[in-house]
């Protein structure tokens, strides 16, 4: 009889545990990180009823890992989409755009060309020029503000990561102290899920239930009960500052990140926002230099050579030296007017053993100079002239970085305050020919189209007019040579283009070595508006042929394209995440239909076990009555 009671009692206990397990599952159906519990039973020894083998968590490492990876990718895509959406909105279209301001300035110059003697239209030019400068400055402020916002968000994300890793380290301590617990493991799962959204991680799960958390680089965020802080010192120490630093590690882990909000924010800042800011600065420099060249090549109504229209974008700047430089040399960089400037930063490295410097363009990693540091400034490099104050002060391993256009869009201003300073008149170019005085007198005749609208001012040596001389090039051929040693082959009676001077001239008659041509220029007259007509033209800013409107359209297209790609990536990431969540739920999630069926099954089994107890009691009472 005791065997029957024992079997029934074990059945009651087992099915009561089943009811408790099902109730726990139902209660936590909406609890984040909860893994469904499942009761496992086994036959008691000797066939004396049933025992509870274990209450098992339905935890599947593969589906959890896939979910974590999907969360990291979605976190990165979501952060990138948010950032680039704000970036796209910074570039306005319509009448308030920079492109529209370019158009209105061109229209104002065209009005001056049509009415060169009317002062009012020249005043409009200055007003529209100030509008262009203001648009540049406004756009620069917006992009700078977004840069600052992203830096703060990166810092805040690093703080959230530190909070989560600290909690995981504390949880590891609890697991070591109290042993594995379903509630602690569920809490661990939730923290890992939250952390995966913020940063890409790798997990090393231990037998005692604790977990080590690593970055993709292998650097540990959590090791046992210790958590290491992640910091973001962006912008704190110039171009050589690390993007990320990890407590106790000399390596910058940012390059190894493959997902998470942290990676998405950093990628949006470094790969889209920073290049766009450089492109905007390049546009500001190119536009200002192009306008200034044309302005300086003309004459004002008073017959004075024109001055710069815009300022704030020219001049040499000093490169940043790496903190560990042991030498004391400084590197200066100056953009060349009208050169093909590239939107890129540069890094110069000195090899003391070979006594050479290597200049690398960081946008594509190309080496643009490698050689003697003393010859660095001999030639233009990407439209820039790099110069060391004293190459002897360099020390092995010294490095310099420089972003030649940085901040130009925010600094551009209108240099002119008086509309009478506008160089609306063309240059009337003149020339005089001096016989070389050789044994055979020459009879050289020169003709010039006059007046001319020059794209750039005539080059001069000091205050002297430029002089060109006919020389023998060494092979018996006469060529025209300028003061810088540039030589131009000519044919008598045919037009000769002197590109550096913006001129075309024709030589005829008899030429002899030693003949000299002295160029001069003066205003074409107060009623002339030819130079204003040139200033109104939509001309190429750089050697690639792009105009100001083209460059702005390219900026707008880049921002819009990046934002669109980020939006599509977020949508795709959401689908992948949803699929990973469904797979995880299929393994570890609570299905209420299944739980309802299990609840009914355990309830019926419990009632049947109770009935067995009742039957056993009836039999026992019958036996007692017989005995009595």
Which residues make up each language-model segment?
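S/T-rich, low-complexity, solvent-exposed segments of bacterial secretion/appendage proteins
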Residues: 1-628
